[in-house]
């Protein structure tokens, strides 16, 4: 069981590392000025923010307005990338948990009826402990002792 928990932790760490190292994508409603003429169009724009190459710069750099493509979101994953990643992570974790539970249940094998019958016929069963001399029942309750003979 400890091995399964370790695998789940490693999987979660991999997903967290992948989410932290990917570029942050945000879909924002904005007004894009495609040329210097002042013509604007209201739409959604998919903006990628990147850290600048120089470590002395403190602000985030955004792409040029002329390089930004104005488009409408086409799917759920384009509109909500974080929610899509979270749903994918939950699905993967659920599958891993189901597989680990299935392997745990499968590892606890019970002997088949044939094996237990052979063991009983050979007499390798542990004998039952003797009954106590004094019954744990209260005195007003009658005691009934029954011995079941064992045929060999």
UniProtKB/Swiss-Prot annotation:
Q: Where in the cell is it found?
A: Host membrane
Give the signal sequence positions: 1-20
Family classification = Belongs to the HHV-5 UL124 protein family.
Q: Which domain of life is it from?
A: Viruses
Q: Which organism is it from?
A: Human cytomegalovirus (strain AD169) (HHV-5)
Name of the protein this chain belongs to:
Uncharacterized protein UL124
Polar residues compositional bias, start-end: 32-47
Bilayer topology reads: Single-pass membrane protein
**Annotated keywords:** Host membrane, Membrane, Signal, Transmembrane, Transmembrane helix
An example Gene Ontology cellular component term from the record? membrane
Residue segments, region Disordered: 26-47, 110-140
